[in-house]
């Protein structure tokens, strides 16, 4: 049961970015998952603060990464092209410009998405590809995959070096509202497996929830400790923001 309803909102919202000096968030990870098949998520990126994991993200364009708004920093190092953090063969690209959705709220995490503009283009390859943005929203019951380098244990943390994946199912707003009450907003999407620990956790924030080959969610928040049965993970529902994503990339080319 979500004890979070009794906690202050900033504690309840597992804002899933690893804490760094001067930043507001605390991270999310993959619980009860397994290493992703090598190269199966070529759009996955890690946002680093120095060499430390801060958040996940997803490549939507050679110059643009989509992530959660609560992952905002002044500067980013973007890791892409390898499932292993610290791999010297990976591309590492600096980024200093980011654009939060104008409707984002630090209190409720509504509209929790942000575009990060890379200082130079990513080199596309078999290991670096753009994710496909959705043309429609997927229905409840759809099986999706969430991925990230976040902690695999909670409340104690154990961070993997290899990208982790777990399959979850989309949950209807009606069923998710039974857990989170008025904390759930129209821009949010819930996913999980009933009576299972399968979920995202610290460090996974901003990472992709991919359903049938399209990006449907970005890891946003959940209850703590992570992986509590019947407490779904909460994601930003990307299908409701495709126009903002495309308009923002065009405006800031």
From Swiss-Prot:
Tissue: Abundantly expressed in the skin and is expressed by keratinocytes in the epidermis. Also expressed in the brain, mammary gland, cerebellum, spinal cord and kidney. Lower levels in salivary glands, uterus, thymus, thyroid, placenta, trachea and testis. Up-regulated in ovarian carcinoma, especially late-stage serous carcinoma, compared with normal ovaries and benign adenomas (at protein level).
GO biological process annotation, one example: proteolysis
Cystine pairings recorded for this chain: 36-165, 55-71, 137-239, 144-211, 176-190, 201-226
Signal peptide: 1-22
Induction (UniProt): By estrogens and glucocorticoids in a breast carcinoma cell line.
UniProt propeptide residues: 23-29
Keyword Cell inner membrane recorded: no
Stated family: Belongs to the peptidase S1 family. Kallikrein subfamily.
Name of the protein in question: Kallikrein-7
Protein species of origin: Homo sapiens
Gene: KLK7
């Amino acid at each position: 049961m979500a004890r979070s309803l009794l906690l202050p909102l900033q504690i309840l919202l597992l804002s899933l970015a690893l804490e760094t000096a001067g930043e507001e968030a605390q991270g999310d990870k993959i619980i009860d998952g397994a290493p992703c098949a090598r190269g199966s998520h070529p759009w996955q990126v890690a946002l680093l603060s120095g060499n430390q994991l801060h958040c996940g993200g997803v490549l939507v364009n050679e110059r643009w990464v989509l992530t959660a708004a609560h992952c905002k920093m002044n500067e980013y190092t973007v890791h892409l092209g390898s499932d292993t953090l610290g791999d010297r063969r990976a591309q590492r690209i600096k980024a200093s410009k980011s654009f939060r959705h104008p409707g984002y709220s630090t209190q409720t995490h509504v509209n929790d998405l942000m575009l990060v503009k890379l200082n130079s283009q990513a080199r596309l390859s078999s290991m670096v590809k753009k994710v496909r943005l959705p043309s429609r929203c997927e229905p409840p019951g759809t099986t999706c995959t969430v991925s990230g380098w976040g902690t695999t244990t909670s409340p104690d943390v154990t961070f993997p070096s290899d990208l982790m994946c777990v399959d979850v199912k989309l949950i209807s707003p009606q069923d998710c509202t039974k857990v989170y009450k008025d904390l759930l907003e129209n821009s949010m999407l819930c996913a999980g497996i009933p009576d299972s620990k399968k979920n995202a956790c610290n460090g996974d924030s901003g990472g992709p929830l991919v359903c049938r080959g399209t990006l449907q969610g970005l890891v946003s928040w959940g209850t703590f400790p992570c992986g509590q049965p019947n407490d779904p993970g909460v994601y930003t529902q990307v299908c409701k923001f495709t126009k903002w994503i495309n308009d923002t990339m065009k405006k800031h080319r």
